[in-house]
Design a protein with these regions (language model features):
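Acidic, glycine/proline-rich Ca2+-coordinating loop motifs
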Residues: 1-222
Length: 222
């Protein structure tokens, strides 16, 4: 079939018509190695084309979630990330250093693994940090990172991402489940390419250790 995966540590995958030709392609998230896109040629054969499409990101990618959020006729993708795990575990020596007259900072070689958390005024401790999630817009066969301009880039320990139109305005919104010390996010689609996190005004309670979410009309009210 042409799908081999090499020796990458695959963490999540989705079937979606990425090239908009009427058949399902396969997109695979890999941990700390390039993500893979296998395009379906319609005969049971696939070819790898992640670099060509701008989808060969290298990060702590976990789950891809496809949706045509901008309603232009092709599928965009939200890449959920989690965190990097340092080989050998936590370092013996503190991974941060003191800065004269200011807050301590994480040493550059540890910055993708750890962050500083203020435990009390002037007292800091080490904390594992989640990686920033990515929103990639499909611009006719080439994906563009619009995470910052869309307002959807959030660092967290993401575990699932669910698209659905929660406010019934015809635009797909996004619910992101985060684990550990990170709150969930509910990104309302503003219709102009930007999103607003409305979680605190819409959802009264979130567990702060979410691992999955789904949506449905439970009370059958439309």
């Amino acid at each position: 079939s042409g799908i081999d995966g090499d020796e990458a540590w695959a963490t999540g995958a989705a079937l979606a018509d990425v090239d908009n030709d009427g058949d399902l392609d396969l997109y695979v998230c890999n941990y700390d190695s390039p993500n893979a896109l296998y395009l379906n040629d319609g005969s049971g054969k696939f070819r790898e084309a992640a670099e060509e499409y701008g989808l060969a990101q290298v990060d702590a990618c976990l789950v891809p979630s496809f949706c045509d959020y901008d309603r232009d006729g092709d599928l965009d993708v939200f890449l959920l990330t989690n965190r990097y795990y340092r080989k050998g575990g936590r370092p013996v020596e503190p991974p941060f250093e003191e800065v004269a007259g200011g807050r301590p900072r994480v040493k550059p070689e540890f910055s993708k693994y750890y962050g500083l958390k203020e435990k009390s005024p002037g007292s800091y401790g080490m904390d594992e940090v989640g990686r920033p999630d990515l929103l990639l817009r499909n611009d006719g066969g080439k994906f563009t990172d619009v995470s910052d301009e869309s307002g959807i880039r959030v660092d967290g320990h993401g575990l699932s991402a669910t698209w659905w139109d929660y406010d019934h305005d015809g635009l797909m919104d996004l619910y992101v489940c985060n684990d550990f010390a990170d709150p969930d996010n509910l990104f309302r689609n503003n219709g102009d390419g930007t999103f607003t996190d409305t979680i605190t005004s819409v959802v009264n309670y979130t567990p702060w250790f979410s691992m999955g979410a789904d949506a449905g009309d439970i009370n059958n009210d439309g």
